Amino acid sequence: MFAQPLSRSCATGFRRWLAVSALAMALQFTLAQPSVAQAPTSEEIWNELANEIFKGRLLADGTGLVGIEMPTRAEDAAIVPVTMRVTLPLGDPRRVKALTLVIDENPAPVAATFEFGDNAGVSMISTRVRVNSYTDVHLVAELTDGKLYVVKTYVKASGGCSAPAAKNADEARASLGQMRFRTFGNPTDGGASLAQEAQVMIRHPNNSGLQRDQVTLLYIPAHFIEELAVRQGDALLFRMNGGISISEDPNFRFSYLATGAATFAVEAKDNAGKMFRNEWPAKPGL
């Protein structure tokens, strides 16, 4: 069973975007000289988003605790790689409970929230996202002490949320929900305590609602993976709540601590209510 989603829905994301747009209009109308239009600064946009997403909670500087890596200039705005890392110092008794990825200028800024199992040992997770315009990207970590920490990077990309899908609708339907899972390394003979890596891929169009059918030119309704959970045996590794900013055919590579469990399982649900599940034996090279 899935837990309550930690991230906002697609509709909430659009409302947030409208709220930021309203802020821009308000700032414009309050200028002393009406002829000069002034857009909100990136700091103002982030402050508005942070206040809504995190309900006014204090966000401390997360440098040295978490990190985010993205290309400064993306080659393809529809599939921009992002790697999130947990870099807590050795001896720090805390752990990261959840990561929230926010692409400030996207129509639905909360790209995904990742919740980690108690003993998962996830210190790295990477995926691909859509970026709609030049933007700050923030990563917010919630630690077990209840505090929030934030880091950011800047990405030059545009048009990712409206870029045409790589596959047509028939191809997407034919492979909908198909999964692949692969482990890296060899968690055997004493390696159960060592960090390993794995990758999960699921076929899904993850339509943003801003893309047009290339034949009819009508907008394609938003259709995306809303929840995804990965387990090692019965133990949760991570749970993702996502939206339209995750790229087509969602793909997640992550580290974890091997426990010697016999299987890995992945469950996913999209915003149309379709459920997908698969299971694999715990051995490398799948």
PLM features: what roles do these ranges have?
Residues 1-13:
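N-terminal secretory signal peptides that target proteins for export/translocation
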